[in-house]
C-alpha cells in the first residue's frame, strides 16, 4: 500500500513515526527522572530524622565519602531542583511533540481523504 501513496504522504508518515518514537523516548526519560526524584525525596526525609551532628556517608562514584548532614541535605535539594527543571523541560517537549503528532495525523487523514475511511 505504501508504494501507492504519493511521496509527500510517505514523508509525512515517516515524520509521524519519528515523532511517535520521540514521544516514547521522552516518556521513558520522564519516568526515570520521576523515579530519581522519588529517591531524592525519600533520602531527604530520612536525613531530616537524623540529629544535626549525625555522621552521613554518600556515594561518589565507587567511593563512599563521609560528609555532614547539612552538606547532604544541600546536595539533595540541589539535585531535586535540577530534576524538577529537567522534568519541566521534558514536559514542554512532550507537549510540542504531541501537538506536532496530531498535526501530522490530521494532514495525513486530509490528504488521504475519504479513501482512509
Curated annotation (Swiss-Prot):
Pfam families: Prefoldin_2. It is found in: Cytoplasm. HAMAP family: PfdB (MF_00307). One of its GO terms (biological process) is protein folding. Gene3D superfamilies: 1.10.287.370. It comes from Methanosarcina acetivorans (strain ATCC 35395 / DSM 2834 / JCM 12185 / C2A). Its main location: cytoplasm. Heterohexamer of two alpha and four beta subunits. The gene is pfdB. This is Prefoldin subunit beta. GO terms for molecular function: protein folding chaperone; unfolded protein binding. Keywords: Chaperone, Cytoplasm. GO terms for cellular component: cytoplasm; prefoldin complex. Belongs to the prefoldin subunit beta family. NCBIfam families: gimC_beta (TIGR02338). It comes from the Archaea. Molecular chaperone capable of stabilizing a range of proteins. Seems to fulfill an ATP-independent, HSP70-like function in archaeal de novo protein folding.
Amino acid at each position: 500500500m505504501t508504494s501507492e501513496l504519493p511521496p509527500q504522504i510517505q514523508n509525512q508518515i515517516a515524520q509521524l513515526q519519528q515523532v511517535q518514537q520521540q514521544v516514547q523516548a521522552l516518556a521513558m526519560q520522564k519516568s526515570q527522572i520521576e523515579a530519581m526524584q522519588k529517591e531524592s525525596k525519600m533520602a531527604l526525609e530520612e536525613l531530616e530524622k537524623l540529629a544535626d551532628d549525625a555522621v552521613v556517608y554518600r556515594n561518589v562514584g565507587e567511593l563512599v565519602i563521609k560528609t555532614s548532614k547539612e552538606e547532604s541535605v544541600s546536595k539533595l535539594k540541589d539535585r531535586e531542583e535540577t530534576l524538577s527543571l529537567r522534568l519541566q523541560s521534558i514536559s514542554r517537549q512532550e507537549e510540542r511533540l504531541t501537538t506536532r503528532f496530531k498535526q501530522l495525523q490530521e494532514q495525513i487523514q486530509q490528504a488521504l481523504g475519504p479513501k482512509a475511511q
